[in-house]
From Swiss-Prot:
Function: Essential cell division protein that coordinates cell division and chromosome segregation. The N-terminus is involved in assembly of the cell-division machinery. The C-terminus functions as a DNA motor that moves dsDNA in an ATP-dependent manner towards the dif recombination site, which is located within the replication terminus region. Translocation stops specifically at Xer-dif sites, where FtsK interacts with the Xer recombinase, allowing activation of chromosome unlinking by recombination. FtsK orienting polar sequences (KOPS) guide the direction of DNA translocation.
Organism: Rickettsia felis (strain ATCC VR-1525 / URRWXCal2) (Rickettsia azadi)
Record's comment describing the protein's domains: Consists of an N-terminal domain, which is sufficient for the localization to the septal ring and is required for cell division, followed by a linker domain, and a C-terminal domain, which forms the translocation motor involved in chromosome segregation. The C-terminal domain can be further subdivided into alpha, beta and gamma subdomains. The alpha and beta subdomains multimerise to produce a hexameric ring, contain the nucleotide binding motif and form the DNA pump.
Alphabetic keyword roster: ATP-binding, Cell cycle, Cell division, Cell inner membrane, Cell membrane, Chromosome partition, DNA-binding, Membrane, Nucleotide-binding, Transmembrane, Transmembrane helix
Membrane-spanning residues: 15-35, 62-82, 92-112, 116-136, 142-162
Gene Ontology CC annotations of this record: plasma membrane
Chain's gene name: ftsK
Protein name as catalogued: DNA translocase FtsK
Amino acid sequence: MLYYINKILSNNKVQAVILGIIGFAIVTVLTSYNIDDPSFNSVTTEYPSNLVGVFGSYLSDFLYQFFGLAAFIIPLACFVWSRNCWYGRYRGSFIRIFVMLLALISSSTLLSKIKLEFIPANAGGAVGIIASNFFERFTNQLYLLLIFFTFIILVVLLEIKFTSLSNFIIKLGKFLIYRVQSFLHNIFSQLSSVRLFPTKNNDKINITSSYQKPVSEKVKFTEEAKPVPANPIKFFSKPPAVPKISQSEIAELPPISLLRDPENHNVKGASSSELKQKAEELLTVLNDFGVKGHIININQGPVVTQYEFEPAAGTKTSRVVGLSDDIARSLSALSTRIAVIPGKNVLGIELPNKQREFFCLKELIETPEYQDKSTLLPLVLGKDLAGKPLIADLAKMPHLLVAGTTGSGKSVGINAMIVSLLYRYTPEECRFIMIDPKMLELSAYDGIPHLLTPVVTEPSKAVVALKWAVKEMENRYRMMSNIGVKNIAGYNAKILEAVKENRVIERSIQTGFDPETGKPIYETVTMNMEKLPYIVVIVDEMADLMLVAGKDIEMLIQRLAQMARAAGIHIIMATQRPSVDVITGVIKANFPSRISFKVTSKIDSRTILGEQGSEQLLGMGDMLFMGNTSKISRVHGPFVNEAEIEKITEYLKETGTPEYISAVTEQPEEDDSSIDIGDGTSDEVLYKKAVQIVRDERKSSISYIQRSLRIGYNKAANLVEKMEKEGIVSPPNHTGKREILLPER
C-alpha cells in the first residue's frame, strides 16, 4: 500500500495539484481572518468567521503574529512551485525553503514600520520587529539594500529570466525607434512633395492599359528607405508563402529543463579480460567454419562491441558475411552484424553487449556537437559504436529517408529529430509541414507555432500540400534570382545586410513599350524585406500515400528532392514497409541519405540501403545511417518519451500561436489536374481521357491504356469494360482483340 502511495505522490502532476491546493487554502485562511476569532491570544465561545474554521483562525493568527502581511509570500511560493512541478522544472527542496525564508524575513523587515489595526501585530509581524531592531544598530541605509535584496529574491522566486527581460526591453526599444523614424520620414516626405517653385522638367507618368509580360529585370539598391506599395507585384496569384510572425508572438526556444535528466543505470562495460575471452571464442567459431584470421582491435560501445577481424589472404568477404547467423547461434547472441569497415583491411563483427546502455536526448543536446552553429539543421541521431554523439546536418543531406518495422524505434527517432530542430529554431526561422496518414505519430505536435498548416491526415490534402511546397520552391527561386544569390543562406544574408543599413531592395521590371516612342517602360517594385525560413516536410507513412496517389506523390517528391535544397525546403520521409513499390527507384535516386532501423528481411535491407544488415539490428533505436557519402554507420538512437514531447509542445503553445496558411491544403480552383484518390470525379476524368486515346490512337488494349494513363492494370481493365458497356468498343473475340466502334475523326 505504501509503495502505491509513494508512486502516486512521486508524480509531478500530483505534486503540482497538492501545492496548488495548499496555496489556495493559505490564501483563504489569510483573507478571511478576523481579529475577534478564537486564537492563541483570545478566547471566545462564538464560532469563528474564518472560512476554514477553528484551524484557519489559529493558523491565520499565527502567520500574522510572526510575519504580518509578508505571510502572503507563502501561498505565492506554493503557486510558483506548483507551476514548476507541472512543467517539470524542478529545484531542490532546500533551495525552495531557503529562498522563501529569505523573502519572508526581508519583506517582514520592510513592513515592520507600518501599523495596521486589523492584524494583531504590525505589518511586519514579530519577525519584522526583531530583524528591524537588529539592523538599526548598524545603519538606517541598510533598508535600501533590503529593498534591492527583496527584489532579487522575488525575481528568483518567480523565476523571471533576466535574459528574457533584457530581450523584451531591447525589442521594445527597437520598436519605438522604428516607429519614430517612420513618423519623421512620413512627415519629411510629405513636406518635400510640396513644391514652392515649379521645376523645369515636367514629371511624366507612363500608364499601360494592360499588363505585358516582363522582358527583363534589373535589381538595384537604394540608400533611402521608401514606403512599400500597397499592391506589390507577386510572382503568382496565391497569397504570400510564409507570413512573418510578429516579434511579440515569436515563441521562445524551449528550456532544456523540459527534457528529463540522464538516469544512472550503473551499466558496467565488460572488462578487458572478458573482451579478450569473447574474442578468442569468436576466433574459435570462425576456425570451426574454416575461416582463418585474427582480431586486431576491439571497440566497446554503449550497445554493441565491434571486433575488427582481419581474414587470411584469399578469404572472400561474402563468405564471412554469410556466417552472421551461425556466429550468433554459436555465441548465444541475439544477432550478429558483419560489414566491411571503410578505409581498413578488416571486417567489423558486431556483437551485442550483455547490458545495454540507455541514454536520453538531453545529454546529446547539451553536447558541443549540437551547439555548433555551423550545423544549420541539426538532427540528433544518437551515439556511434565508440559512444560519440552523432549529429547530422539536414541542410547537407539534403533529404532523409527513414524505414523500419513496428517497434524498431522509428517513431522515437523521428521525434528526436523534430525536437532537435525545435530546440534550435524559432517559428520565424523554421517551419514544418507534417503529413501523418495514420493520425497517430505526429498528432502531438498539432498546434505548435512552427506549423504552416495543421497536421495533414488525408491523402488528398497531402498531395495538395506537396504541390504547394513545389510552388513555394519555385517562388523562392524567383526571389533569389532577382537579387543574384544561389541559395537561401545568401538570400537571408543579403536581406539582413540591407535591413542593418536601413535600405530596401528594389527591382525594375519592364512592363511594356511606349506606343509613341517605342521605348521600354519600367516599373520599380520594392521586394519583401523578410528573411525566408527553412521548411521541413515530414511524411510519417509513405506507404499509405503511395497506395492512394502513387504517381502524383512520386513526381512531387522527385521534383522537391531534386531542386528544393537551395530553396531551404527539406524532406524527412518515413515508412514501415520498405518494399520496392513504396521506395521506388526514382525516390531512392533522389534520397542519398537514408536511415534503416530493424527490418524483417534481407530484401528490405537491400531496398533501403543497397546491402543487407538491417535485419540483424537489435531494435529499440538501433539503426544504420547512410549519409550522402554512401558510408554506412551504426548508430544507437536516444530515447525521448511522450511526456517530454507533451511538455515541449505545451510550452510552445503557451509562448506562441500558429499562423496557418490555408493555401497549403486547399485545392486551387484554377488547378485542373486530377488526382486519382478513388472518388467519382477522378474516375470520370480518367474515363474521358481513355475514350479520347481509343478514338485518336485506334488502340483499345488494356495494357496500352495502362501505359498511356500511367495507372494500374485493374483500373485500366475497368475503363475498358465501361467502354464496352457504352458501345465504344466491342467484346473481345476469340483472340482477345476488340473492335473500335467509334468513327475516326
